[in-house]
Amino acid sequence: MEAIPLVRSSLSGTLLVVVKLSALLIQNRAHLYNFLLLKIFLFNHWLLGLTQEAQGFHPPSKIAGCPVGRVLWAGLTLLEVPVCLALRVPRLVWAGLLGCARALGLGPKWLGAWEQLGLSAATWTDLFLSCLHSLMLAALLLLLLVWRLYQKAQCCSLGRLPRKALLQNRVVRRSLALLKSLYWWVESTAALTSWHLAYLITWTTCLASHLLQAAFEHTAQLAQAQEAEPQKALGLSSETPPPGPPAPGARPVLPEPGTPGE
């Protein structure tokens, strides 16, 4: 019977540690977003290189006046706009929803319900915003991957043979299918590796900060205990009064006769 409460206490302690680490991960999500922005920036740079290679098949004079090229360059230069929107729009929307809820008098009820679950409203807000950011960044990356695949197919279709001949050739179609499958495999492997690396760095940072916080709290408790010991000693010494001088009318007690004091 005693083993069941021990198991429950260990499970509750493990769940509490997991919740704390999740909260720390949410608080340190800026590092993950910076890593994703760096990845998107490198991805954009690679796309620029691919477009330059694709445009190298044609004379530069035609490329400069081509409307498709201008649209492509404009889209690449405006790539930072959806990234900024993906990072800022959810926070603005959430702030508007909270303002409307407070205006309608629903804010305190939501805050009380969230605090009953063991986490503050700020933590739940950060969790919601991080989920929205992750979804929007994933959608943006998916759009970029689709666009790059389309550009890759266009680059592969450009050559000496016409497009119809390429489509009718089975060898070319099989090679394109193999290249597509290889590309998707490399892309999925790279994405998983980068995500795992980002989560590993984030979790390591959270664990280090959690350990530092625990060490700081332990040091503060030890310092408080050491400061309390002299105060206790002073209190005990003040409670016991010092022996006063003898009264003036009192006489010293003489030893009785027959005692060893004679």
From Swiss-Prot:
A GO cellular-component term linked to this record: membrane
Membrane topology: Multi-pass membrane protein
Keyword Ubl conjugation: no
Main location: membrane
Domain of life: Eukaryota
Subcellular location: Membrane
Annotated spans, Disordered: 226-262
Transmembrane spans: 6-26, 30-50, 67-87, 92-112, 127-147
Compositionally biased region (Pro residues): 240-262
Keyword annotations: Membrane, Transmembrane, Transmembrane helix
Keyword Lyase: no
Listed PANTHER family: TRANSMEMBRANE PROTEIN 270
Name used for this protein in its record: Transmembrane protein 270
Taxonomic path: Eukaryota, Metazoa, Chordata, Craniata, Vertebrata
